[in-house]
Curated annotation (Swiss-Prot):
Subunit structure: Able to form oligomers. Microtubule inner protein component of sperm flagellar doublet microtubules. Interacts with ODAD1. Interacts with BBOF1.
Gene of this entry: Mns1
Protein's name in the database: Meiosis-specific nuclear structural protein 1
GO biological process, one term: flagellated sperm motility
Role: Microtubule inner protein (MIP) part of the dynein-decorated doublet microtubules (DMTs) in cilia axoneme, which is required for motile cilia beating. May play a role in the control of meiotic division and germ cell differentiation through regulation of pairing and recombination during meiosis. Required for sperm flagella assembly. May play a role in the assembly and function of the outer dynein arm-docking complex (ODA-DC). ODA-DC mediates outer dynein arms (ODA) binding onto the axonemal doublet microtubules.
Family membership: Belongs to the MNS1 family.
Top-rank taxon: Eukaryota
Tissues expressing this chain: High expression in testis. Expressed in pachytene spermatocytes and post-meiotic spermatids.
Predominant location category: nucleus
GO molecular function: identical protein binding
Length: 491
């Protein structure tokens, strides 16, 4: 029993092991199957997700394409609208530019017509042209005076060069004469030295002669001592020698006197020559001073003549300018007076025309009223005559008369309205004419100020009287111009 139990237990265990292995194997299979199913499910899910994603992406792409198309259409429409607005703006701008250009051309033409027809502007232009002519004439006069002054300067320069050349030649001649005088003085000095040398040699010869004489005297004395007989002979000989010595001394004295006289004569000639040279130099310097004084006097005379000529010319030009300006001022005054009289006459005429128009209007109104009454009566009579036969009934006749009266009043009202419309149109035309005249006056004033701004500064000092109508015109041109103009006007 126990063995059986043990055997059973073993088989149970074995069976359990087998069952357990089977379960494990089954579990493994199940797990593998589940894993495969899970993998398949995952793959299926991934495929489904991929398909769904692709479908979603296609939907998104389609929606994005639709959005892009819609946005492109909106952009195209917006661009078209923008282009249309731009074209419209460009067209408006072109029209505005054309209008401005047309108005500018119209304004230019109007200004041109105003400039051509305005007496004031023409007179201002004539004054400015006259000022330019005065300026040009003054410039020509200044240029001529400058040319004459330059010619005088050139003449004075030529004269100065000639005087310098003359002075140079005189100095060279004086230097040559001084060299000759020095050479002559040196020659006389050398001659005097030679004479002194000759005198010295003669003195030495004389001393030598005296020595010989002493020797002779000594010999004579010895001879006299030795021989009395011979003494007489020696005495005679001595007398002869003494006579010879005396003759020699006389000859020497005569020669010395002659040399002294020659030297005195030579010194006198030298002194006389020096005096002559000094006198000549004094005369030359006097001539130079005289020539220089004459040149200065001539130059001063020419300068005075030039100054007098320029002064006379300036005075003449000033008188001419004053006369011209007075004539222009008188002409301008006459023109201004004529314009004032013309304006006054026009104002009177306009006033008279207005009064005449008002009187005529009253007459017309009165005549219109009378005509209306006459017309009214005539029409009433006509209507009454026309309807008298047809209207037998008094009530109908009164109604017809009222109808005729209303018709007549309507006609009268229409004629009155037409008359008032005509008068209103005439008044508007008059106001338009006044505005146009005011615009023309503004253009004339603007053109006048423009001409002054453009030309007044260039013509300062040459502007005739009457160019500036008001003090504001001068102030308009600037502080510097005003000061210069007031300074010149004060001068």
């Amino acid at each position: 029993m126990a063995t059986k139990k043990r055997a059973l237990s073993f088989s149970e265990k074995h069976q359990k092991l087998v069952d357990e292995k089977f379960r494990k194997s089954l579990n493994i299979q199940v797990m593998n199957k589940l894993e495969r199913q899970a993998k398949n499910q995952v793959v299926q899910n991934e495929n489904d997700e991929k398909v769904e994603r692709q479908r979603f992406l296609r939907v998104l792409q389609n929606e994005q394409f639709e959005l892009d198309m819609e946005e492109a259409i909106q952009k195209a429409e917006a661009n078209k609208m923008l282009r249309d607005r731009q074209l419209e703006q460009e067209e408006r701008l072109a029209n505005e530019l054309a209008r401005l250009k047309h108005e500018s051309l119209k304004d230019k033409k109007m200004r041109q017509q105003v400039r051509e027809n305005s007496i004031e502007l023409r007179e201002l232009e004539q004054k400015l042209k006259a000022a330019y002519m005065n300026k040009e004439r003054a410039a020509q006069i200044v240029e001529k005076d400058a040319m004459k002054y330059e010619q005088m300067k050139r003449d004075a320069e030529i004269e100065r060069i000639m005087m310098e050349e003359h002075d140079r030649l005189l100095k060279e001649e004086s230097a040559k004469q001084e060299r000759r005088n020095k050479e002559r003085a040196q020659y006389y000095l050398d001659l005097e030295k030679q004479l002194e040398d000759q005198e010295r040699r003669k003195q030495e010869a004389y001393e030598q002669l005296l020595k010989e004489k002493l020797m002779i005297d000594e010999i004579v004395r010895k001879i006299y001592e030795e021989d009395q007989v011979e003494r007489q002979q020696k005495l005679e000989k001595k007398n002869a020698i003494q006579k010879y010595i005396e003759e020699f001394q006389r000859a020497q004295d005569f020669w010395r006197q002659k040399k002294r006289e020659e030297m005195e004569e030579e010194n006198r000639k030298i002194i006389e020559f020096a005096n002559i040279q000094e006198q000549r130099e004094g005369e030359r310097m006097a001539r130079v001073h005289e020539i220089e004084e004459k040149r200065v006097q001539r130059q001063n005379l020419l300068m005075k003549q030039l100054e007098e000529t320029l002064r006379q010319r300036d005075d003449l030009e000033q008188v001419r300018q004053e006369l011209y300006q007075e004539e222009q001022a008188e002409i301008i005054k006459l023109k201004v007076k004529e314009e004032a009289e013309l304006r006054l006459r026009r104002q009177r005429e306009m006033k008279q025309d207005f009064e005449d128009q008002m009187a005529l209007k009253e007459l017309i109104l009165q005549a219109a009223k009378e005509e209306e009454e006459t017309f009214k009566k005539a029409m009433l009579a006509k209507f009454a005559e026309d309807d008298r036969i047809e209207l037998m009934n008094a009530q109908k006749q009164r109604m017809k008369q009222l109808e005729h009266k209303r018709a007549v009043e309507k006609l009268i009202e229409e004629r009155r309205s037409q008359f008032l419309a005509d008068k209103q149109r005439e008044l508007e035309e008059l106001q338009l004419q006044q505005r146009r005249q005011g615009c023309i006056n503004e253009i004339i004033e603007e053109e006048r100020l423009r001409l002054l701004k453009e030309h007044a500064a260039k013509l300062l000092g040459y502007l005739p009287k009457g160019v500036f109508k008001r003090e504001d015109d001068v102030d308009m041109l600037g502080e510097e111009f005003r000061k210069a103009y007031q300074k010149r006007d004060g001068v």
